Amino acid sequence: MKKRIILAIVSSVSLLLAACGQEDSTSSQNSSQQEIVSTSQESSEGQSSSKEEKKEQTEAYYTSDTGSVTKVDAQTHEVVDTIAIDGSAHNVQISPDEKVIGVTIVPSEGHAEDSSDSNESMEMEHDEDSDTSMSNESMEMGQDEDSDTSMSNESDDEKGIAAFYDTETGEKLAEVEVGSHPAHIVFTNDGSYAAVSNNGENTVSVIDVSTYEVVETIPTGEGPHGFRIAEDGKTAYVANMGEDTVSVLDLESMEEINRITVGSTPATTGITSDGQTLLVTLNGENALAIVDLTTNKVEKVAVGNGPIQLFVQHDDQYVFVANEGTEENPSNTVSKVDLNSNEVVETIEVGSGAHGVVISEDDQYTFVTNAFDDTVSVIENETNEVIATVEVGETPNGITLK
């Protein structure tokens, strides 16, 4: 029985969230959640050995605008560590070697989690992605991060922070000054650099992780928010919420090399592993833009209300889009889009204000932060059902797995 409980990723994943004021779940809630997860795990025993051989996820990190990053054990649904942050934590990502957590921080009020608040480029409250920010991203967050609706270019010149923490000890390794209203943070696949989108000043800061120094600041379009870096580490695709475009950045020459018009209020991006297809959430028109990067042709797929972050499955078969809506008109769904047919094949009901989204490495589970009801939903991807709902801190946004 113990082996069966350990089998699935949900029982081995610990969630790290940025949230303060975390409320402890009652023992009865923990028990019922564990039973749900255990049942799901037992039913998955017949899955192929190739999936079982894939690396298991063990922890997840996500942030909240209440000023902390919190680690939660997914089996017990208990907080095991909380990192207090001086400011508003927006988005988070773990380094490729899983030793470092990067967090974007707005020193005072700023990026809240509400995609609604304006169209992310006005991301006042929006996302891993996020989130997610690109839940992508969205906006994490959630974000994922990410209240992903662009904080907009306020004339606030106060610089933001990218902070880095040891995943084992929670010790702060470095604090780097970046631009105004930092939104999302993404590591290159080799772990050499971390890039931060500065929503308030239309730039991306590139940080050398070996020295924790900004080595370049790259101009972008208006209101940069969620973004992803291609697998080869050479190109970043940044959603500009303020001007309906995506900036294409060359990370070798450290300059913008193209700008693609995609649609209203792009919140975050995703890219397939072959680097041929770009996915962009269009918060202003409730759609997902699918861009053929060989031609820059854009196809749009209608999704839910107020899409923020997205995450592409590792096998490139599906993309999951978190639909946050607004505080006045919240959404509580995730759209699952088939990338072969470019159609929504499932609409999954989660918590209110779906924001950050991330998928386990074996593609079996999707984790979604729900910004308006302070929970995380765990989706079993084969059945498209929510198998666990975890109570977390206030306004969770960006989310990333270890």
Predicted regions: what they are:
Residues 4-12, 16, 21-402:
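Predominantly soluble domains enriched in secretory-pathway, periplasmic, or organellar proteins
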